[in-house]
Curated annotation (Swiss-Prot):
Gene3D superfamilies: Chorismate mutase. Involved in pristinamycin I biosynthesis. Probably catalyzes the conversion of 4-amino-4-deoxychorismate to 4-amino-4-deoxyprephenate. This is 4-amino-4-deoxychorismate mutase. Coiled coil: none annotated.
Length: 129
């Protein structure tokens, strides 16, 4: 993956001038991190809805074919965008482990909220019915 060109630093007029481009890049990184965290939270909330569907319809929590599909999608994305596929596999393994844990707890609780932040936020917003 090749990073985009970075604008040339302004003429040095002191320590602050040298950090302005870095500060701007860090601000963009912070915004990207906020979007990433919101996307993860949204994904976890959706997985709780899936857990509720599975609970109501007696669908097994573990769906190996779905996990394989998610990994295949990530591998395709990695290939298309020059990202290390092993990195995305590790990232998705972590995400999938957490979503399976949440779904399993949701199903085992009979749909009652369990004491984790994502459950509390989902219940408070009415995200899980």
């Amino acid at each position: 993956m090749t990073p985009p060109a970075i604008p040339a630093a302004p003429p040095a007029t002191g320590p602050a001038a040298a950090t302005d481009p870095l500060d701007a890049l860090r601000a963009r990184l912070d915004a990207a991190d906020a979007a990433l965290l919101d996307a993860v939270r949204t994904r976890l909330d959706i997985c709780l809805r899936i857990g509720e569907y599975k609970r109501l319809h007696q669908v097994p929590m573990m769906q190996p074919h779905r996990i394989a599909q998610v990994h295949a999608n990530a591998a395709r994305y990695a290939a298309d965008h020059g990202i290390d596929p092993a990195f995305l596999r590790t990232l998705y393994d972590t995400i999938i482990t957490e979503t399976c844990r949440l779904e399993d707890e949701w199903i085992a609780s009979g749909g009652a909220p369990v004491p984790t932040p994502v459950h509390a936020s989902a219940s408070a917003r009415g995200a899980v019915s």
